[in-house]
Amino acid sequence: MDITRRKLIGYLLSGAALSVSPFATHAADALLVPFGTLPSPQKAHRVLSAGAPADLLLLALAPEMLLGLSSFDFSVSGSEFLSDTIRKLPKLGRLSGRASTLSLEKIVSLAPDIIIDCGSADETFRSLAQRTAAQTGVPYVLVDGKLRDSASQLRQVGALLGVSSRAEKQARLAERFLQDAEHFSRMSGNSPRFYSARGATGLETGLQGSLHTEAAEQLGLINVVSEPSQHGLAQVSFEQLLLWEPDIILTQDANTYRYITQNALWKNLQAVRKGQVLCYSGLPFGWLDSPPGINRLLGMRRLQAHFDSKIQANWMDDLQQFFRLFYHSDLNQTQLQRLLEAG
């Protein structure tokens, strides 16, 4: 038996498996839900990300503490817009989401001081966090990842990791974007009705109130796909789309955009015929949706700029500032032009 497996079994048999922290019994709307005894900010030097939204939060706040990324492999592509520190991070696999690819043995061998996840904080993810902390002996923090709470997420996780100064600068930019979005939502009058298109044929979508459509909904745009008892993703039929007749169609996938704009069936929708299909593919991560992390601040800002000339006038400066603060990268003119074309 190798030492990693022996150590893991030791946790489970000796009673060293962590009990739930008292903080974990907080109300369901708590922003940070910890499991286990958290390290002090001065001792949290090795941080493990549990999923893609946490990757984005942590590479913004503390890339030097990250052991690696859960979902992105920058040795393949997408790293030219990021700092050297981020570019060198390995892909380790993910804990949360569909089909975990990171084993408990691997977690123990990495010896993190803390595991952080961000996104949905429902009972499924709380159960995973509690179980992982108990089985590995590593404290785990679940961050409720709603877009409107981005500034608070940055401040609270920044304080947890001892990087409050950096977090405050990021939080202030997030607050400015969100406050402008809130003002726009109140002043826009008849809000456009939108459909968020995902997948090869555009018939996967985010339900109203889901993490996947917050960037548009934060601006007051109305999601045509609403199911009060459900959140998350759903498959719809084209017949349903014809009944909904959205004013605009949003996507962040260039292949989805091409399919929608070139397929004869989709031309039955007024939004397609009128050229109201907006594609914000973004780089190096999706801007509107995937992953549903703080990267969506950019998608929200870009979408507001489409409707608001005052925001459009400063879009280039906002884009540069976001990359400087969140991705620790000063864009050159070539990179900036590529981003403007992608968004």
Q: How would you describe each model-predicted region?
A:
Residues 53-56, 72-75, 120-123, 146-150, ...:
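Solvent-exposed loop/turn segments at secondary-structure junctions
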Residues 122-133, 251-267:
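A ligand-binding cleft/hinge motif common to bilobed small-molecule-binding domains
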Residues 1-2, 22-39, 47:
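C-terminal segment of N-terminal export signals and the immediately downstream linker at the start
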Residues 30-31, 37, 41, 126-204, ...:
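Extracytoplasmic substrate-binding proteins
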Residues 7-28:
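N-terminal export signals
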Residues 208-232:
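Alpha-helical, coiled-coil/dimerization segments enriched in small aliphatic residues
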Residues 225, 232-256:
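Ligand-binding pocket segment of bilobal, Venus flytrap-like solute-binding proteins
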